[in-house]
């Protein structure tokens, strides 16, 4: 991700199992679940995202960012892409 780049809010759906794992590998990034504070991602940070949790992830405003993203196998798994993270939401991150 280039500085300031982030994906839209999205959900990794599954009726059993599922979800996603993120591992920070370079730079500085963010992960946020809807209604919760953002979590900083640095190299070595591991984030487990349960199935059916609305979230987003991306780079910090002043840093390139890279992560490995792994889909966790689940039953009836699918992804739902939602609205963009607004500049107002993103600009609150420190």
Label each region the model flagged.
Residues 4, 41-62, 72:
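Conserved metal-binding segment of the jelly-roll/cupin
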Residues 5, 12, 29-31, 56, ...:
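Ligand-binding pocket scaffold of soluble enzyme catalytic domains
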Residues 5, 15, 74-76:
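Feature marks short, surface-exposed loop/turn motifs that line or immediately flank catalytic pockets
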Residues 6, 16-43, 53:
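A short beta-strand-loop-beta hairpin characteristic of the jelly-roll/cupin
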Residues 14, 45-47, 87:
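A short, sequence-level motif marking secondary-structure junctions
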Residues 19, 49-51, 90-94:
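Short, surface-exposed linear segments at secondary-structure transitions and domain or protein termini
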Residues 56-94:
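Double-stranded beta-helix
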């Amino acid at each position: 991700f280039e500085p300031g780049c982030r994906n839209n809010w999205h959900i990794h759906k599954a009726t059993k199992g599922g979800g996603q794992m993120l591992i920070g590998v370079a730079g500085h990034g963010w992960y946020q679940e809807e209604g919760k504070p953002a979590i900083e991602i640095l190299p070595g940070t591991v984030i487990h995202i349960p199935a059916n949790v609305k979230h987003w992830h991306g780079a910090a405003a002043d840093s390139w960012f890279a992560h490995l993203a792994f889909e966790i196998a689940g039953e009836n798994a699918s992804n739902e892409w939602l609205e963009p993270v607004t500049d107002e939401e993103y600009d609150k991150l420190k």
